[in-house]
Swiss-Prot record:
A Gly-cisPro motif from one monomer fits into the active site of the other monomer to allow specific chiral rejection of L-amino acids. One of its GO terms (biological process) is D-amino acid catabolic process. It is found in: Cytoplasm. This is D-aminoacyl-tRNA deacylase. GO terms for cellular component: cytoplasm. Coiled coil: none annotated. The gene is dtd.
Length: 150
């Protein structure tokens, strides 16, 4: 499982049926790979909930998202598992099939909520417009395999 965390001043995701937005917090781009499990979702959710990615008065990254009353916008993104080794068109066979991936994606979002976080989401498996106003920028990539951070 791969999650790209971007610290944002604001972010939104829209399509024909959806309009979710947050102010200060994280925009998460969530990739579910063939071998991704609920254990991977748990360890990444814990890391994100406790990550100190917001500055204190001395410009040190000392505050986590709860300490700054931030929110999360979680967007599924199977393209994080693109295979670009051959040719010019990426392959996506490393992504988990959608029926299984959606379950892990929803489990991951619920795991974040279990830490008391406000989590808004995109719509799994649809084309969306994602607007991200990066803050910093601060971008961290979390990856887990077999329930362990890589």
């Amino acid at each position: 499982m791969k999650v790209v965390v971007q610290r944002v001043k604001e972010a939104s995701v829209t399509n024909d049926t959806l309009n979710n937005q947050i102010k200060k917090g994280y925009c998460l781009l969530v990739g579910i790979g063939q071998d991704s499990t609920e254990q991977d979702a748990d360890v990444i959710a814990k890391k994100i909930a406790n990550a100190r990615l917001f500055e204190d008065d001395n410009n040190k990254l000392n505050f986590n998202i709860q300490q700054v009353n931030g929110e999360i916008l979680s967007v599924s993104q199977f393209t994080l598992y693109a295979d670009v080794k051959k040719g010019n068109r990426p392959g996506f066979s490393n992504s988990k099939n959608p029926d299984q991936a959606v379950k892990i994606y929803e489990y991951f979002n619920d795991a974040l909520r279990a830490y008391g976080l406000t989590v808004k989401t995109g719509e799994f498996g649809t084309h969306m417009n994602v607007n991200i106003n990066n803050d910093g920028p601060v971008t961290i990539i979390y990856e887990s395999q077999d329930g362990k951070i890589q």
